[in-house]
Amino acid sequence: LKILSAEGYDKTVIFSMITDGGSSAMELMLLGVCGPASSNPILFLDPTYTNYIDFANRLSIPIVSVNRQIDDNGSFASLNMNAIESTIIKDNPRGLLFIPYDNPSGQFLSKKVICDLAEIAVRNDIWLISDEAYRSLSYVGNESSSIWALNESDVKGISGRRISIESASKVWNACGLRIGGLLTDNYEFHQKA
């Protein structure tokens, strides 16, 4: 939470759980959002970080996904918000996972894009889940991007439905330390995880 505060985010209503690396946080998130051996799916944006797929499969959690297209220049096209919402309506996932500094696509998701995803999550009453392992990175011409930059004035109803996966392995280059975290602004989810 001190890192969030140092980066300028309001941490007053965020609950945290320190985990044995980001991988443990990923598993706890999946279990908390969908339940073990659940019929409740999770929504990924394809391609996604492969460990999420492995963990969901191991925990018998169904996966639904929205494929992203590659433009003629070899870059991933902007997210198709209509396809994301249609998939949510059709498959009823419990949560939508995204990575603002996307691994493996390399696509940067701006605050505007995250707001659009948040509005979809609020409209469809699902969790908005962000893998924040790269949050401290910033790129020329882009401000840092995080689920924790959103507030009620950006997206009415977002409070209480955000979850983030934290890891010291990427930005801090500390893979061997196995320090991760699961953050949420929902006390009930925090207690369940």
Locate each region found by the language model.
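Walker B catalytic acidic pair
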Residues: 132
